[in-house]
Curated annotation (Swiss-Prot):
Pathway(s) served: Glycolipid biosynthesis; lipid IV(A) biosynthesis; lipid IV(A) from (3R)-3-hydroxytetradecanoyl-[acyl-carrier-protein] and UDP-N-acetyl-alpha-D-glucosamine: step 6/6
GO molecular function: ATP binding; tetraacyldisaccharide 4'-kinase activity
Family: Belongs to the LpxK family.
Binding of ATP, residues: H51, M52, G53, G54, A55, G56, K57, T58
Cellular-component GO terms for this entry: plasma membrane
Name listed for the protein in its UniProt record: Tetraacyldisaccharide 4'-kinase
Function: Transfers the gamma-phosphate of ATP to the 4'-position of a tetraacyldisaccharide 1-phosphate intermediate (termed DS-1-P) to form tetraacyldisaccharide 1,4'-bis-phosphate (lipid IVA).
Highest taxon of the lineage: Bacteria
Origin species: Rhodopseudomonas palustris (strain TIE-1)
Length: 340
């Protein structure tokens, strides 16, 4: 869905008119969040958002995977598979699954590690354990109570933060903020903006950890676009951030097209993009997530679509390492004590 503009502006008449519905939605979401979950035999780390839309969960998940592997862990990502038709539980296989089957983010991540898609997260966790997981990384699912989480890391964009701070549909929040803050163990603030500073202070005050991070373009992606004029397009939570990252890397963005998050590109839309690129002598560039969703349809266009890959770099990686090790050790000690 495309986010309404009023979600990211000071409270307006529209948002105020929607507050009664937001109160009902918030009460239901809060009651659901507080339900008891199933305890899994391995640590469960959740990477989530307070709000609808994207803020960098997937790059954060992949960065955590890299660190966990350095610790000698075998992480398996568990995803709901948003946008896919399969109920699961199923291990994602990039050679036979498409984004229409299991969602764009799971497909993209499955090229790098084991990913399980399941609508029922308890069943998904069982499959992840059967695959040899020593740690389960939930990609999204912070508000879902199905599994007991040993640590919840919430990702927020430093420029957009949580918008107007209201619960859906008056604003972008998935549940009342105080409840979500209370259940947060670490806040990952992506970027160098100040919009999330107040939120970070709330997390610090309650004893949580605040981690600063930034999206760093992969050198190969920057090199592939050197000297080219590009038409950038993206169907992600914040397409403007994608364009800003391109320009910040020295890429000459001549044209840009924004689509809703998880947008299913039609053949007509792709053909129009290809025609515009050919007409103006531009190179099409998009995100890895969008390219996963486009899939084999790219082959019929007659033009190249260059994926622009980014990774998440933490400002204080030692702080993150200590946090992860503490949570992993604490989770294992608690699970061991529970078996006695």
């Amino acid at each position: 869905m495309r986010e309404p503009g009023f979600w990211h502006r000071p409270p307006s008449l529209v948002s105020r008119l929607l507050l009664p519905i937001a109160a009902i939605y918030g009460n239901i979401a809060a009651a659901r969040m507080q339900k008891a979950g199933t305890t899994v035999g391995v640590p469960v780390l959740c990477v989530g958002n307070y709000h609808m839309g994207g803020a960098g969960k997937t790059p954060t998940t992949l960065a955590l995977v890299a660190l966990l592997r350095e610790f000698g862990e075998t992480p398996v990502v568990l995803s709901r598979g948003y946008g896919g038709r399969l109920q699961g539980p199923v291990q994602v296989d990039p050679s036979r699954h498409s984004a229409a089957d299991i969602g764009d983010e799971p497909l993209m991540m499955a090229r790098r590690l084991a990913v399980v898609v399941a609508r029922d997260r308890t069943d998904g966790a069982a499959l992840a354990c059967a695959l040899g997981a020593t740690v389960i990384l939930m990609d999204d699912g912070f508000q879902n109570p199905a599994l007991t989480k040993d640590a919840s890391l919430i990702v927020v964009d430093s420029h957009r933060s949580i918008g107007n701070g209201s619960v859906f549909p008056a604003g972008p929040l998935r549940a009342p903020l105080p409840l979500q803050v209370a259940r947060t163990d670490a806040l990952v603030v992506v970027g160098d903006g100040a919009a999330a500073d107040g939120l970070a202070q709330q997390i610090t005050t309650k004893g949580g950890v605040v981690l600063r991070a930034r999206l760093v373009p992969e050198p190969a992606s920057v090199e592939a676009l050197r000297g080219r004029r590009v038409l950038a397009f993206a169907g992600i939570g914040d397409p403007a951030r994608f364009v800003a990252t391109l320009r910040g890397s020295g890429v000459e963005v001549v044209e840009q097209r924004a689509f809703a998050d998880h947008h299913p590109f039609t053949a007509e839309e792709l053909a129009e993009l290809a025609a515009a690129a050919k007409r103006d002598g531009l190179t099409l560039v998009t995100t890895e997530k969008d390219l996963a969703r486009i899939g084999r349809a790219q082959q019929a266009l007659g033009v190249e679509i260059v994926p622009f890959a980014v990774t998440l770099a933490f400002g204080d990686e030692a702080k993150l390492r200590l946090f992860l090790l503490d949570r992993l050790n604490g989770a294992r000690a608690a699970k061991l004590a529970g078996r006695r």
